[in-house]
C-alpha cells in the first residue's frame, strides 16, 4: 500500500506547535479593514489554536 500524502492546502494553512496543538490564522483580516474597528483588526492579525472538534482531522491531513 502506498504512503499517505499530506494535503498541501492544509499544510499551508495550519502548523503544528511543539506541544502537538494545531495553530491557524484568523479569517476576515486581510481586506475591507476600514469597516472594522482597531480592536477587531488587531485581534484578527493574531493566530489562534484550533479547537478540538477538527483537530484530529487536520492532523491526519497534515501528517499524511
From Swiss-Prot:
HAMAP family: Ribosomal_bL35
A Pfam family hit: Ribosomal_L35p
Keyword Metal-binding: no
GO CC field: cytosolic large ribosomal subunit
Molecular functions (GO terms): structural constituent of ribosome
PROSITE patterns the UniProt entry points to: RIBOSOMAL_L35
Protein name: Large ribosomal subunit protein bL35
The species this protein was found in: Chlorobium limicola (strain DSM 245 / NBRC 103803 / 6330)
Amino acid at each position: 500500500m502506498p504512503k499517505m500524502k499530506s494535503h498541501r492546502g492544509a499544510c499551508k494553512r495550519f502548523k503544528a506547535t511543539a506541544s502537538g496543538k494545531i495553530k491557524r490564522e484568523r479569517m476576515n483580516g486581510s481586506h475591507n479593514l476600514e469597516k472594522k474597528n482597531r480592536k477587531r483588526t488587531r485581534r484578527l492579525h493574531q493566530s489562534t489554536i484550533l479547537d478540538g472538534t477538527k483537530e484530529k482531522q487536520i492532523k491526519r491531513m497534515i501528517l499524511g
